[in-house]
Swiss-Prot record:
An example Gene Ontology CC term for this record: myofibril
Subunit structure: Homodimer.
Species of origin: Schistosoma mansoni
Primary residence: cytoplasm
Name of the protein in its database record: Paramyosin
SUPFAM superfamilies for this protein: Myosin rod fragments
Subcellular location field: Cytoplasm, Myofibril
Coiled coil: 23-839
InterPro entries, alphabetized: Myosin_tail
Amino acid sequence: MMNHDTESHVKISRTIYRGVSPSTTRLESRVRELEDLLDLERDARVRAERHAADLGFQVDALSERLDEAGGSTTQTQELLKRREMEINKLRKDLENANASLELAETSMRRRHQTALNELALEVENLQKQKGKAEKDKSHLIMEVDNVLGQLDGALKAKQSAESKLEGLDSQLNRLKSLTDDLQRQLTELNNAKSRLTSENFELLHINQDYEAQILNYSKAKSSLESQVDDLKRSLDDEAKNRFNLQAQLTSLQMDYDNLQAKYDEESEEASNLRSQVSKFNADIAALKSKFERELMSKTEEFEEMKRKFTMRITELEDTAERERLKAVSLEKLKTKLTLEIKDLQSEIESLSLENSELIRRAKAAESLASDLQRRVDELTIEVNTLTSQNSQLESENLRLKSLVNDLTDKNNLLERENRQMNDQVKELKSSLRDANRRLTDLEALRSQLEAERDNLASALHDAEEALHDMDQKYQASQAALNHLKSEMEQRLRERDEELESLRKSTTRTIEELTVTITEMEVKYKSELSRLKKRYESNIADLEIQLDTANKANANLMKENKNLSQRVKDLETFLDEERRLREAAENNLQITEHKRLQLANEIEEIRSTLENLERLRKHAETELEEAQSRVSELTIQVNTLTNDKRRLEGDIGVMQADMDDAINAKQASEDRAIRLNNEVLRLADELRQEQGNYKHAEALRKQLEIEIREITVKLEEAEASATREGRRMVQKLQARVRELESEFDGESRRCKDALAQARKFERQYKELQTQAEDDRRMVLELQDLLDKTQMKMKAYKRQLEEMEEVSQITMNKYRKAQQQIEEAEHRADMAERTVTVRRVGPGGRAVSVARELSVTSNRGMRATSMM
């Protein structure tokens, strides 16, 4: 559909070329100016595309180099992939722009009535390209001189690298001597290790003896604990017996008191009985005479009672005596028991003191046993650490040997790279010879292009003659159009009745236009919101990419720091080894001192305070010996630190020499790559010039064919110009507006293309500076971050441009509405001024044709706005 519209537009422009309106000259000049500007914009676009292709090629080459340089990190690869995706996206955008521009170019080519300006512009472009080729030639000559100077510098750098290699060989010999010293120290360490292992075995035997003694002490402790338990049990039994004896003593004391009371009662009874006996005797003496007869009868009873009482008294006296004796014996037993109780109390106190002393000794023995066990564990741990440190020292020695081997390999690699640089210098010389040969070919091609330029000038002269003929035909068509204008003015008076229907149709078409414009506005707003969301998502993605790039930059900074730390680790390796050795010797002294302390403490358990004093003196003497050993070790550490500083200085000199050699190698590689890129660029430009020449030749032939077709169509258009003059003028005006809008779009697209070309050129310059500083990856990533920020700004600028375009379309809509209102006003004025007359069928047909032309113009305007 779009192609059909463009073809109709082209046909309209070709038919109007011989119109009869007085404003056609102005419109035609405007059309020619627009076409000239479009041609200039197209040529600028072609140059921008060519330059963008070159920049894309260079960006691809530099991206490959960046891939090779940053292959160690996956994050930089992802970043480069994103950059490639963005470049591909930009290429797609350029291709889409190119496609749209090509479509516009085809439509403009069909509309163009002459090709003279294009041929003149092609000639000017060829001249400009010739001047550009000459400038490139001079630039290449200057670059060849620079390359020769760089080759001289490379030879000088080679000589300096050879001298540095000799210095590195001397340093390598010195490092070999240092490795021999380290090997000798390793043998000494192995001897010390064997001595330590023998001492470790002795310590293990001593430890076993200590463990046996600890077992004996534990057995003695258990026996002492059992004795203490027996003594505790016996003490408890004695306490119980004492309590029982005290209870018996109290019970006996109570019995004694009872017996004493009974004895007192019995003695009182005996005294009472004696008093009664005396009374009885007195009664008997008094009553002897009275009771003489009874006395004689009762004497036997009395004697019997007396005998009973005497027996009772004797029994009581015997019991009292027994009780007195028992009391005396109890008193003696009491005194004896009190003495025994006092003795038992003193014995219990002594036993408690002995028990507390034994408990204290048992606790001391337990603490001593735990200390001995802890020290034995510490000794075993220290022995294990010494063995692990010894293994670490051996591994570090092997690592030093591997580092020495790596240095030798790097030396060999530098020699191979030196030979490769010599080969590259030879290849550069051959490429210079090829470039000179290509320059001669370019000069021959220039002569051919000058001959073709002469041919094009002759063709231009022929085209100017054809243009003169076409001007004559145009004047004739102008006269015909004037005649047609007079006829149309006569018919215009006859179309008063048609104005009402025309007004209705215009109002209807205006309503349709308003509906379509509202739909277009809604569609455009939705499209604008979608584009805005898409650009916002792109901005968010770019911000995410910026964050990832920042993270990648931080990771690369960390890796750079890690690489620098690696060199520092190599420098501090000897210091660590010496520190480990010092720690091992200190640990050995500590273990020996602890062993002696253990032996002294075991002897302290067996011996007295005098042995402890002797052991203290012995420990002081050993401390003095340890201090002397520490002083000797400090002297050794000082010597080792001096050796370390000397080795650090040698390593720094070697590192600087290696950095200089690597920098010289990279500089030569960069120069070779730049020369290869320049040679490829010249070859591409040569091919492009050949393609441009072929394209110009084909375009010239095509334009000749189109000129013939245009002349035929112009002759056909002369017949139809009398009928369609006014309609064609209106369409021409609409087409001029469309061309102006297209010219604005083309100018914007050209500006965008130029901005993209400038951006590509800026990216090329940035990438070129990155290629020169390829070794510093952090700066390259910073440049990539800057580019992403610029791209974010470009997207924001594009979003703002889209908003500006929407504003422009709204302004155009308002302008079109104003034009419609002005047309209605003019129609009203014409309706009021033109006399009301009946119109014929011819006039009605003209009005219907005019109405159809107006509706078609509005439809075309609506499609162009969409």
